[in-house]
Amino acid sequence: MAATLQFLVCLVVAICLLSGVTTTQPHAGQPMDSTSVGGGLQEPEAPEVMFELLWAGLELDVMGQLHIQDEELASTHPGRRLRLLLQHHVPSDLEGTEQWLQQLQDLRKGPPLSTWDFEHLLLTGLSCVYRLHAASEAEERGRWAQVFALLAQETLWDLCKGFCPQDRPPSLGSWASILDPFP
């Protein structure tokens, strides 16, 4: 399970780096934009900064909140920004995550996600990985794994907009076995 968690975290971090090379712009009607994020969050962090913060590791506390493990990094402006995003904009339960996923699926035929929404999507996926790892019951692990797989598919959909033939992203295919909580 630890190797799977490490692989999934590395996958999300790699996708975070990919988000830095996308050229998506905010669009009206998106689930979140820079005006709804709050005063100190005017634009997403550079991918290398986000990579450093995530590489330091996160921990899930007893209240279900994710925190940066490295206190020094957590005290920096980017660290405080990430903490704010994780606490106030990334769903902390299955129902909230499923609602966010439904909003993304409703937007699938539209333009690429804004930079804010793409970052939100990636952080929600990362949150799923930690919650999957912390889940104690098989049924809950299965639901978190399913939601993570769907978020990964939405990430591929968004990255593929305008590039993939017939607007169809590559399938998760063999990745599904990695995400299976019942090996």
Swiss-Prot record:
Residues 1-23 form the signal peptide. The keyword Protease does not apply. It comes from the Eukaryota. It is found in: Secreted. One of its GO terms (cellular component) is extracellular region. Its main location: secreted. Coiled coil: none annotated. It holds the Pfam family FAM180. Transmembrane segments: none annotated. Keywords: Secreted, Signal. Belongs to the FAM180 family. This is Protein FAM180B.
